[in-house]
From Swiss-Prot:
Keywords: Early protein. Induction: Expressed in the early phase of the viral replicative cycle. This is Putative TATA-binding protein pB263R. Belongs to the asfivirus B263R family. Putative TATA-binding protein.
Length: 263
């Protein structure tokens, strides 16, 4: 009787879908030079705190800790990654450290194509990502560069989302093997290419093919946390969220179990 009470019906079985981190991006007009050439032309100044490239490094006074230095290969058995220059940064890119609302962002700029990446964006409206790109362009506009730099577009590259099963008790956990079995049995909004069963009862993982060549991973954890990782649009995340929310609502009492009361 106690277990039936623990698994009673709830109208709000899951929390709302939330973005928790994003890699935001954009494109600027071509700088008509390589990263090797550009790093030699750039002169460090606000709002950029540090510049890192495989062919040069600069920083403002007080930001020396942002300068990247070569790392030693600790695993001698692993084949070393092919690098260029001093190997401290992403190949073909210049990395700029820029501050926004007390958070340091590491923007990657690929000068030959104009592509921009800003990892670690946390604002749901992408305000921080847009601001970082705008600050970078303003910085470039005051540098000795022949071409006028302009923003061509903003875009999302990768978005991670999360939500949580609303527990009726701290003793209620997800039966991960049953959850994995349901994913294999029930029609899904996107084809599932891979389901990893729980290892040591930690999580269930599955990959949805949301478009040709684009996979989105979900992780379902024992305590009810669910991550939707690697989306390039909010719409695909919402589709997967709706599917999982309905699955949980229909199979609520099947996929949950109750831990014994501690002595």
């Amino acid at each position: 009787m106690e277990d039936e009470t623990e698994l009673c019906f709830r109208s709000n079985k899951v929390t709302r879908l939330e973005m928790f981190v994003c890699t935001y991006g954009g494109k600027i007009s071509s700088l008509a030079c390589s990263h090797m050439e550009l790093i030699k032309r750039l002169q460090i100044a606000e709002p950029v705190k540090a510049l890192n490239c495989n062919f040069g490094h600069q920083c403002l006074p007080g930001y020396e800790s942002l300068i990247k230095t070569p790392k030693k290969n600790k695993n001698m058995l692993r084949r070393p990654r092919k690098t260029e220059g001093d190997g401290t940064c992403f190949n073909s890119a210049i990395e700029a450290s820029i501050l926004f609302k007390d958070k340091m962002y590491k923007l990657k700029c690929f000068p030959s194509t104009g592509e921009i990446q800003v990892p670690g964006v946390i604002f749901p409206d992408f305000e921080d990502g847009k601001n970082i790109i705008q600050q970078w362009v303003e910085f470039l506009q005051h540098q000795p560069i022949e071409k006028k730099v302009q923003i061509i577009e903003f875009k999302t590259i990768m978005i991670n989302f999360k939500f949580q099963i609303n527990p009726v008790s701290p003793r209620v956990i997800i039966h991960l093997k049953k959850f994995a079995a349901l994913l294999e049995q029930i029609p899904t909004p996107y084809p599932i290419r891979e389901i990893k069963p729980p290892l040591e009862d930690s999580k269930v993982s599955a990959k949805f093919m949301v478009s040709p060549g684009k996979k989105v991973r979900i992780n379902v954890f024992l305590k009810g946390k669910i991550n939707i990782l690697g989306c390039n649009t909010k719409e695909s995340a919402e589709t997967i969220y709706t599917f999982l929310k309905d699955l949980i609502s229909v199979h609520w009492q099947e996929i949950l179990c109750v831990l014994p009361v501690p002595d």
